[in-house]
Amino acid sequence: MGNLKCLNKQKANFNKDNKVNSELKKISLNKSFQTITTLFKKQNIISMIDLKNKSELRNNTLIKSKEFKKNIVQKLEQKLNKDPYLAPDSLSAYTLMNDIMIQSVSEIVSKYMFPLVSPTKGENISIVAVGGYGRAEMAPYSDIDLLFLTPYKQTAWGENVIETILYILWDLGLKVGHSVRNINESLRIAKNDITARTSLLENRLIFGDVELANQLNKRLWKEVFSKSAPEFIEKKLEERNLRHQKQGAERYLLEPNIKEGKGGLRDLQTLYWISKYVYKISNKKDLIKYKIFTKDDLEIFFKAEDFLWTIRCALHI
């Protein structure tokens, strides 16, 4: 993917000012999507809403967010219909579109619909993308998995904010799965549930308290990931074998499952997950550094990945 960095400004904390926090990860968009990137910048959802009109704030947020989504989706689908092989590069564009909607809705809900006069530390919340959304690989109609991370037990304010955000996102037609947990709960579940642990392996802060999200990651690596590599490898390989049996343990099927079948996207992801878990790599190119792949191997890996994403995106639209 290209080097163009373009992530919409993100609010650093629910309860603080609107300063941009440079620590938040950025999404890279390929130059093929430069015109759409410009559209992202121009269409600031919050600027299109009368924030003083409290009685219509929820409805107006929904209307303007739907307009934004419809416009961007139309542009992206036109581009993919014209050139299906741009599909791998579109994953970041779809991710960014969802990021902007979630950030905008979250800021409006937390700051204008449920303003706090005297916020406490207990009201800090981080909205964290996990799973495929966390690694910024979003096909046109992929599910969005979110972790609403709280420092302690959830407050009444937090319940209202999270519930309102979710209902607006659902009304937007987004397929959002979610969990609401504090750090200790997240660690406990990660230790006991391999699926939850895998999804947390690739988490990404979307909105909210940066320090809270950083604390989660530090403790995940210290208390969970670094102590359980052999178990993780065994579980993921066992999971792969069961998946292959279910889908038909053959490479060449008349109607293969692009995601779950043998040699499909999930197999490529499993290889990367294991490598990330063991070596704490943050980029697939690091697979060469740790001698998991040769340069030629990595090129084959990327070609296979691009091909499978091209098919999957084509099936989505």
Question: PLM ranges: what are they?
Answer:
Residues 2-317:
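A nucleotide- and high-energy phosphate-metabolite-utilizing enzyme signature
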